Structure formats: C-alpha cells, structure tokens
C-alpha cells in the first residue's frame, strides 16, 4: 500500500475512535464542559443545569463535521441559540502527556471539551 493509503487509513481509524468517544461507546473517554458554557446554557437550579448538560450531550452525539476535519476532532454546533465548539484532545493513558499514537486506543485517552468560542 502507498503512504497516502496508509495515512488515509490512519485518519479514518482516528475518526472512528473519535466517533465512538462522542457517542458514548468509549468507556475511557472523558467529556468536559467549560463553566462558562454551562453558566450560559444552564439555569439557576441543579435540574436546569442537568437539562442543559443533556442537551449538550445530544448535540455532541449528532454533530456534523466540516471537510477540513477528517479526523472529526473539531466541530461547531448550535445549542439553544448558543454557538458551541467541540474539540478532541489525545492523551496518554495517565492523562499526563499527549498520546504518541491517537490511532491506537490501547495507548490513547480521548478528552472531549465542549466550550463557547470565548473559552477557546
């Protein structure tokens, strides 16, 4: 196989692993939301905040990606009229350093951050 073919396969593997993390099928992945985003979306009660988090999770699972994000590791979406950014970062299994190989789930932990553009 050519180097280009190998690169495409690697990119698609990373994209599929990112999809699994976004859709809740990767038990090692973490999903975090910035306090600014939760403050803007959530209400004054714990119940309202939990409902805002549920809406964010639904948007995360169904977001679409621009062609310039082949690994599906960055997206912009709208939740309740608020622009929300989604970014996937790749860490080692201890969450201390960057992963040496994001295509290898045995050595990579994904952290998905949901934030406002101002938080980026």
Explain the meaning of each model-derived region.
Residues 4-78:
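Compact soluble domain cores
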Residues 73-120:
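Short, compact, well-ordered microdomains
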